[in-house]
UniProtKB/Swiss-Prot annotation:
GO terms of biological process kind: lipid A biosynthetic process
UniProt keyword annotations, A-Z: Acyltransferase, Lipid A biosynthesis, Lipid biosynthesis, Lipid metabolism, Repeat, Transferase
Protein name: UDP-3-O-acylglucosamine N-acyltransferase
Disulfides per UniProt: none
Subunit structure comment from the entry: Homotrimer.
Protein family according to the UniProt entry: Belongs to the transferase hexapeptide repeat family. LpxD subfamily.
Domain of life of the source: Bacteria
């Protein structure tokens, strides 16, 4: 695919400086860009290295209009420009609407217009598939589930019964949505399984990463609001509620019945306790453990950064002595007070 720089400027709503007829063939990184490529700069440190870049054009911040003489598109946020360019130059396969002969579709399922259903897909009774959906190989969609229009489900994903997906959702490979939550009642040294009779309801424009699991609710539903982005290998337990446009990075776990607000960012490998609430506009940095509710917006951390093993062992040894040191300091303070 080929676009000239003027066309790209129009699609990005960017200010063009340079040759509007210049042909652009690819989007590339700053370091590897060559002639015919366009790149972007969102890292301020790279602004001092523009003479090292071999790209035919660069997306730059508006604040740098006086600092570059080559072909450029100027935007308030070049990273947004990168996102839009990635959409333009996207090479993800886009299969033509068709239903494979090997697909197993219940006679009572409702299939919309221009739908792709690939090999060995199973669509059970009462399922409703919206227009322009793409369902890849080996996907299973359980009874009475619904898919909004323009939703894409990648191979080997499983949607249990009564799962609801909104419009324009993306479900990546091996994701499992609507499996049983971890509900068991202790009884005389054993466990009684509690059937999970809620469901999972997912809004519009949600993306669920590969091998992520979202459990169905016990009594109430597990709710994922519009625009939520959940990375790979995350666990979202039963009855959890995640607010609009919150993003959760890979390997994070959210325990049951926790409510996460809107526009939050949860870093990788974060563990969030159950039955707590996190308000809107909270950032939790990677490897943190959230044990109590967060009631004020802000950035929260609890992870321990890596250090050399010898230093870490020394720090840990000191940590084990904190209680004893605290008692000694209190005793010294009392002694000092008594002597004055």
């Amino acid at each position: 695919m080929v676009y000239n720089l003027g066309q790209l400027a129009q699609q990005l709503n960017a200010q063009l400086v340079g040759d509007a007829e210049l042909n652009i063939y690819r989007l590339a990184t700053f370091e590897k860009a060559a002639q015919g490529d366009i790149t972007f700069v969102s890292d301020k440190n790279l602004l001092t290295r523009l003479d090292e870049c071999n790209a035919s054009a660069i997306v730059l911040p508006n604040s740098f209009k006086q600092g570059y003489q080559g072909n450029a598109l100027f935007m308030e946020t070049p990273y947004v420009g990168y996102a839009l360019l990635a959409r333009i130059f996207d090479t993800t396969p886009n299969p033509q609407p068709a239903i494979a002969a090997s697909a197993q579709i219940h006679k009572n399922a409702i299939i919309g217009q221009n739908v792709t259903i690939a090999h060995n897909v199973v669509i059970e009774e009462g399922v409703v598939i919206g227009d322009n959906c793409q369902i890849m190989d080996n996907v299973v969609i359980g009874q009475y589930s619904t898919l909004g229009e323009n939703t894409r489900i990648y191979p080997n994903a499983t949607l249990y019964h009564q799962t609801e997906l909104g419009k324009r959702c993306i479900i990546h490979a091996n994701a499992v949505i609507g499996s049983d939550g971890f509900g068991n009642a202790p009884y005389q040294g054993t466990w009684i399984k509690i059937p999970q009779i809620g469901k999972v309801i997912i809004g519009d424009d949600v993306e669920i990463g590969a091998s992520t699991t979202i459990d169905r609710g016990g009594l109430s539903d597990t709710l994922i609001a519009n625009g939520v982005k959940i990375d790979n290998q995350c666990q979202i337990a039963h009855n959890v509620s995640i607010g609009a446009h919150t993003a959760i990075a890979g390997g994070s776990n959210v325990a049951g019945s926790t409510k996460i607000g809107s526009n939050c960012i949860v870093g990788g490998c974060v563990a969030i306790n159950g039955h707590i609430t996190i308000v809107d506009n909270v950032v939790v940095t990677g490897d943190s453990m959230v044990m109590r509710s967060i009631t004020e917006p802000g950035i929260y951390s609890s992870g321990v950064p890596a250090q050399k093993n010898k230093a870490w062992r020394k720090t840990t040894a000191h940590t084990l002595k904190i209680d004893d040191l605290f008692k000694r300091v209190k005793a010294l303070e009392k002694q000092l007070k008594d002597n004055t």
